[in-house]
Amino acid sequence: MNLKSDIGARAAWKGFSSQTVYIAYRLMILEDKFDIYPENVEDLMIKKDNKVEELIQVKNISTDLTLSHLKPKDKDSFFRRVLDYKSENLKIKVISFGNIGFELEQVNKRNEEGIKSFKKKMLSYDYTDEEINWIIEHIEIKKENEASLKEKIFEKLNKNFKTSIADNIIFNCLINYISNLSRKVEMTNNKIWNNKVNEIIKDIVSIKGMHEQYGRTILNLSDYRTDKSVEVLSEEYRNGIDAKPDHIRNNLDI
């Protein structure tokens, strides 16, 4: 891999990692009536009663976030895509895991001069006044921190006794779960995730129980010893005796 492609791969992974943590956080705080769709129309789409409520783009770049990072000139840009849902009166969000540039910050604060500059650029990219006004009215640009979001996820996990007993394992399962949803373009919600948590907890309890019993009621076959010869054991098995550890250890049950 050359230097340029290596840098690109690392940047892509950094972005995917931050996006996954953000989606995991949103899943943890969403009410039951909401469904989330990672990597669907946008990095994240949130629906309520099958109606789109939020379209979210997640950015993690090394420089201040600017309008150009959202590629407004492109026919398939973030802004063009969200305008397809204009009639649904949804929220559009840009989540930045880095500083927000001055121009976008001014739009976010609804500063008059900032909005004027934003409008001028968007008009030059062939957006209409109506479209630009709708974007300004519905957009929210928010700075997030990956470490802080992870802390908030752990806080949620530790408030629930069921998930607090193995918070690290549950967290890793959550991140893996969201990653797989993103790759497969599937949806989830609180009910589905809580069912998965119950399965994970059962597995953990089962493994823990086996670990505690190993060496007590559960013994390695090699630990079973007998004074009987292989010939005697073989004769027993041929005569119909139930297979015991000594028969199994000597491969007589095959």
Name each region found by the language model:
Residues 5-8, 12-13, 17-80:
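Catalytic centers of nucleases
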Residues 1-12, 61-254:
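Acidic metal-coordinating catalytic centers involved in nucleic-acid phosphodiester chemistry
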